Amino acid sequence: MATISDVAKRAGVSVMTVSRVINKSARVSDDMIERVNRAISELNYRPNMVARGLATRHTHMIAYVFSNLANPFFAAVSMGIQNACAEKGYTMILFDITSAERFNECLDTLIDRRIDGVVFHHLDVRQENVDSLRSNGVCVATIDNEVDLEGVTSVNGDDYEAARMATRHLIDRGYRRIGCVHEQYEDRSDENRGKKDYIQLFQRRIWKNRTRGFLDEMRSASLEPVCMIEGSGTADIAFAEDKESLQRILAPENRPCALYCENDIIALAVLSESMRQGIRVPQEIAIIGHDGLDYGMMLYPRLTTVCQPRYEMGSLVAHRLIDTIEHKSENEIIFTHSAVVAGDTT
């Protein structure tokens, strides 16, 4: 197995120069970089990442921490993070958080393993968590965190404006009897923690902003919602299996002409039940979702949805986090922009 000394000898440079090229820790001429990289390739040299971490005080590892591996929303985000990490020479590791205990274990692991940075997604990270991580050398970024934080880079979806956009799409197509399927809005106080499934404690901010956007756009058109229906579970797979709620939405006496669903899995569940009952879409009920999951475009009729740039969110947050780790930028708050993708359901 080749060593760093072998690389230095083959390239005709010092071991220190090879180390500087590998770690990008100092200015080295282009000629030196080319010679070292050629020697590395010829010898099939693989740097010792543990030793590299000790030398540079960086492990070149980024953690992506989220709360529901079964939710397809996270796949494109993780791909964006993964590709950005690979581009910059970092490795991504995943944590699927399913309990408060698991969250605390995750925080300890991030510190113990000297992870350079972490992206928390759709969680309720608190300021004390951030302060603890940063004091131990872990940089922090978030996507759609429940509360605003200091000392982090935040990438957030434009949930309020996107919901208005979805509602305006329905109104512009002549629909007036419009309803909404929203999520639960329990108080986020600490005494409520542990009383419900851990995952259900999060994403309240998202649902509130989407509902507020829907209601404000309806009011701007001098319209009142036909119905405001609260989804069950976590507004994903659990709701899709809740036949009672679906049948209540689609009952002839309650059925709106159009329905804004606050995520795509709810929308696909409503679409599936409509097709099962023989209800014509969009002739008898129009449906628009929110998020832009690939599933919606694979089916027929194709789901009309507000598409969030999920891959771009992941790529953006990872690049900004790595820049922070490498002291190339300060923390910032960034809002992404969604767009309506018209399918066959409106």
Language model features by range: what are they?
Residues 42, 83-93, 134-142, 146-346:
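Bacterial carbohydrate/catabolite-sensing allosteric modules
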Residues 42-48, 99-102, 122-123, 271:
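Short gly/ser/thr-rich secondary-structure transition/capping motifs
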Residues 1-59:
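N-terminal helix-turn-helix DNA-binding module of bacterial transcription factors
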Residues 17-20, 54-70, 177-200:
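Short beta-strand segments enriched in small/hydrophobic residues
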Residues 49, 75-76, 105, 272, ...:
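Generic recognition of short, well-ordered alpha-helical segments
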Residues 2-5, 57-172, 251-254:
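Alpha-helical recognition/docking segments in bacterial nutrient-uptake
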